[in-house]
Amino acid sequence: GCSSSEILGEHIGKGSSPETGVVVAEAILKVLNENGIYLAAQCCEHLNRALVVERAAAEKYMLDEVCVRPMPKAGGSFATAVYDRMSDPVMVEHVKAHAGMDIGCTLIGMHLKDVAVPLRLSVKKIGDALVTAAYTRPKLIGGVRAHYPE
């Protein structure tokens, strides 16, 4: 999730910047594509926090497609830029991601697997936006007698 408004020091959703969305989208897509990692870009609450993903990811993970296209004022500038730059984008309602990054307090937790572990990053802000991240781990089950691999 990414708020271009927050990056620019505005209240989330109040200063959407397509130019900022493009810069962030291109930087993130470059790194993820080089490492074979699929991006799920979260839209704003006007699109119920739907996500932009590559069709290949939607098919691989059996995600249900929804019919909408993000725009800067309905979905957000970042999601719009990602949609415009993916080779075959589709929109989905839900994912259960292994990890996530939140730029500007966009509340990505609903799209992570159940046990999220905070990840401390060296970069705390992008522009004026707070940056938080998490990875996930399997649930520990079994109680006091259970043993877990290291």
Where are these regions (language model features)?
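A glycine-rich helix N-cap at a beta->alpha junction
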Residues: 61-88
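Generic secondary-structure signature for well-ordered alpha-helical cores
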Residues: 29-37, 83-91, 136
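Short glycine/threonine-rich loop-to-helix capping motif typified by GTGT followed
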Residues: 9-19, 50-63, 67
